[in-house]
């Protein structure tokens, strides 16, 4: 592990200035922390996308975490984008993530286009390349650097290093954008994203953070963290949740609850 961390720092020290794509997840947080350690805060900026794809709780947590960990010196640029204006994204094919990542990282790069020495960094890790991730193609095409992947860091490695560094989100469940909750082929609409965000926020407030509310065709598929499943099965939260999503216009079958 020490060798991988040393390799990460060594690769970062070769760069003059960097911009880290920061989401608030453990991968991008560790990468940003390592970049600040290797280069100093004045040579690092964080770029954070603000859009309808970020849940309200996720957005608040990301900004609060940044303010706690990097109170001085590191600039945070919040970049507003409108994915619902990207027709190739809204169509929601199996290449949705490719189109989104390509648009988003182009926009990030445009933010510092005059600073030719500044490189954009992404928090992809070694486990990500073992999965189907269309966004990886966009990362390669745009020549975005992936220092965690290059250092051979797995998700488990990253969580351990984040814990050792005192990063409070080291055990935070992985959280993708709200569009991933909509079944492939169904158009991405603002109304759907709002309902997903509202349902997941309800579960979070009820003591089930990290739950996912998926819309597959006309059915709801709910994912609850493994350690919380037993409690979810026996508490009155089920009835409260059923009432809540009914008010949003959805029926719900508790046979469609799985662990994540």
Language-model region placement:
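Mid-to-C-terminal catalytic subdomains of enzymes
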Residues: 149-203, 207-213
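Active-site beta-loop-alpha junctions enriched in small/polar residues
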Residues: 125, 216-218, 258
């Amino acid at each position: 592990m020490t060798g991988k961390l040393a390799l990460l720092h060594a690769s970062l020290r070769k760069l003059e200035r960097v911009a880290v794509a920061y989401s608030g997840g453990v991968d991008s947080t560790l990468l940003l922390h390592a970049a600040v350690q290797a280069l100093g805060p004045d040579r690092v900026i964080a770029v954070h996308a603000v859009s309808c794809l970020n849940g309200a709780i996720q957005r608040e947590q990301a900004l609060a975490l940044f303010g706690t960990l990097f109170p001085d010196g590191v600039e945070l640029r919040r970049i507003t984008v409108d994915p619902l204006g990207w027709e190739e994204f809204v169509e929601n094919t199996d290449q949705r993530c490719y189109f989104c990542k390509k648009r988003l990282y182009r926009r990030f790069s445009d933010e510092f286009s005059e600073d030719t020495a500044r490189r954009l960094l992404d928090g992809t890790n070694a486990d990500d390349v073992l999965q189907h991730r269309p966004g990886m193609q966009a990362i390669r095409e745009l020549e975005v650097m992936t220092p965690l992947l290059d250092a051979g860091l797995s998700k488990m490695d990253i969580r351990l290093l984040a814990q050792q560094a005192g990063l409070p989100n080291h055990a935070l469940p992985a959280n993708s954008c709200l569009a991933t909750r909509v079944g492939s082929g169904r158009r991405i609409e603002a109304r759907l994203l709002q309902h997903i965000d509202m349902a997941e926020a309800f579960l979070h407030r009820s003591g089930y953070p990290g739950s996912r509310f998926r819309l597959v065709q006309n059915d709801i598929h709910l994912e609850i963290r493994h350690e919380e499943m037993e409690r979810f099965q026996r508490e009155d939260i089920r009835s409260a949740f059923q009432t809540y999503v009914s008010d949003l216009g959805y029926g719900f079958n508790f046979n469609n609850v799985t662990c994540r």
